[in-house]
């Protein structure tokens, strides 16, 4: 078993929109890797129930993508609320990661952290205050080494678990082609 203090928590949320004050979490997934980005475990993938009124209020982009992916139907059928999703996710993470040790890992992860702070504060507090944001490397590569960008493409399914897998693969790509680590 790897050292729980060095394992990394990868998280992705799907939301009804981009405003943590008005929108809500509709899906959460996590993956734990070791420090070398080897997957140790995949956590629960949870559709979080929200009201029909909230789902009907989504903008066109979210309505189209979340309906096409089947997520809206899963959210409507779900009996999991924010608190249950939070506790199930923490119970999974505690098996692999020491609380307060892992940065929050993912793509544009600040947005996920904002939603967690509002709706799943215990889970947000489980992370270290630092972020490991793959989108930072993408922005730096775009400016400093744009020739490597075509070498990695994403499917952008906008399903939490698939998005995490792509984020990990993207970081592996940047480690090899940009950071040279």
Swiss-Prot record:
The keyword Hydrolase appears for this protein: yes
UniProt domain Exonuclease: residue ranges: 8-171
Function per UniProt: 3'-to-5' exoribonuclease specific for small oligoribonucleotides.
Compartments in which it is found: Cytoplasm
Residue numbers annotated as active site: 129
Gene name of the record: orn
SMART domains: EXOIII
Annotated protein name in UniProt: Oligoribonuclease
UniProt keyword terms in alphabetical order: Cytoplasm, Exonuclease, Hydrolase, Nuclease
Gene Ontology CC: cytoplasm
